[in-house]
Amino acid sequence: WKRGADAEKWDSWVRVHNGTRIANWHGVISFSAGSLLGLLVLMATHTLWILGVAAPLVMLGYLYNAGPRPLSYTQLGEWATGVCYGGVFACLWLLAGKPFGAAALAGAFAFAAFAVALLLSHQPPQIATDRAAGKHSFAVRYGTERTIIVARGLFAFALVSLAANLWLGGLRGMGTLVFGLAA
């Protein structure tokens, strides 16, 4: 908000609450509660070693939004999104006690592609304001048409990756067929 992106949105917490104080507290409380809950789950399941994978993802998520030059303002914003969401899937896969293999990798790619496709799908209407705020998002760099094409391609890739995850993970036959037809 301080950097000018999304300032035109009238329903933002910053505008509704006349400043960043409430939004900052909301972020601190949400982050603290999520971290505590996640740590309790890892302790209960005796999988604290997953913190070795999860902690860098948390730091990457923080850097995406905070600091003097957030990653969301750079050309790395979309990559950071994909790495974080793919990594979260991998952590959840490991937490479920499944061995990391081709199915996990396909699922991580699916989550990453879904996340980036969703991010890209929201960028075209914000090109002018993002450019004015100094953001270097994919849409600012490549324009509306290319952004939409890439978002659709990532969505299709995500569906194929998810089907591969289901197939490789043991859901064969009718379940995978129904999912494939629905996609």
Regions found by a protein language model. Name each.
Residues 24-28, 50-55, 79, 104-109, ...:
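Hydrophobic alpha-helical transmembrane segments
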Residues 34-37, 88, 114-118, 158-161, ...:
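Alpha-helical transmembrane segments of multipass membrane proteins
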Residues 1-46, 139-171:
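Multi-pass membrane catalytic core of lipid/isoprenoid biosynthesis enzymes
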Residues 31, 57-61, 111, 155-158, ...:
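Residue-level recognition of pore/gate-forming positions within transmembrane alpha-helices
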Residues 167-183:
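Extended hydrophobic alpha-helices typical of membrane-associated regions
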Residues 50-62, 101-121:
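Membrane-embedded alpha-helical segments that form the functional core of polytopic membrane enzymes
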Residues 12, 18-99:
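Intramembrane alpha-helical segments
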